[in-house]
Structure formats: C-alpha cells, structure tokens
Amino acid sequence: MALPEWLVKEIDGVGDHPAFAGVDELERGLRTLAAGYPEITTLRRVGTSRHGEPLLCLTIDGEPGDPTALVFGLPHPNEPIGGLTALHLAARLCADPGLRGRLRHRWRIIACIDPDGLRLNEGWLAGPFTREHYARHFYRPAGPETRWSGRSRWTTRTPTSTRRCRRRRR
C-alpha cells in the first residue's frame, strides 16, 4: 500500500539535525510554539519529574468533538529522536491549519516525558557519534519505564511520567 501524497510530502519536509535536542532545547521549542500560536495552543505544566524538572504539555486545539491524541517523546531517555519528532509534529500542526483539518484531532504533546533520564544522556547528544563516546555518556534507567509501567503486580509505584500521561484533562 502506497502512502498518500500529502504524507510523503510531510515526510520529505523533515529536515536534518546535526545533533539531538536536550531537555532545555525541547522545553524552549514548546514555549516558542505556545508564544507564536496563542490562538490555538496552551502550554501547561502537567507534572514534575523526580528531580524537579517540569513536565510540559502543549495542547493544540482541534474542532469541537475531535478526539484527543497524546504524543510523548523519550519514553526511553537514550532514544532522543522522539523529542525531535514530537517537536516537529507540534510545529507542523501549529503552522498548517490544513494539516490540522486533515488529521482532525486535539493534540497533547509532551516533548520529553523523562527529562531526568535525558539530562543523563546529554553528554552524547551533540556527538561525536562514535560507539566509545556514546558508551561513556549512555544512560538508561533500570527500573520501571513510562511506556509499560502501568498498574500491574510487578510494580508497586507508577512513575510520575506514566501517571501524567494517563491523567485525563478536559
């Protein structure tokens, strides 16, 4: 099955990045979008990480009755492409009313759900992109992860980031 032409154009429009974004850059990106598109966006702190970092959520309005989509980057803090992807999607949705109309959703975008973990990986985000440099600056938590740590018999306390994703807001 071939992708629709509009989607191929969206994919082709994704630019190159010489480095991955850290916590501060992702936060700055969300704040810039909220300031640039106040008529369709709301930026809200939906929680705080274990180490005191804000968990910011950018809401991009849709039409009344549209379903809500939740997008969050960095459920694994050593996979920083998710933050850039979430930020790119937010920028495209803000800039293009046609895209918003085509996708017909209200969007909630958290560019970085694990800022504590991403901070521990920031040593390799700008390179050099060698195995040695990556290994020396690599971090991945050993405990519960945002993406799968819901209520289960194996977890006693759900991480803050998971609770913030699950919380419903009107």
Regions found by a protein language model. Give the residues of each.
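Active-site-proximal beta-strand/loop segments in catalytic clefts of secreted hydrolases
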Residues: V46, L74, A111-D114
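Gly/Ser/Thr-rich loops at beta-strand to alpha-helix junctions
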Residues: S49-H51, P77-P80
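Short beta-strand-to-loop junctions in surface cap/lid or active-site-entrance loops
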Residues: C57-G65
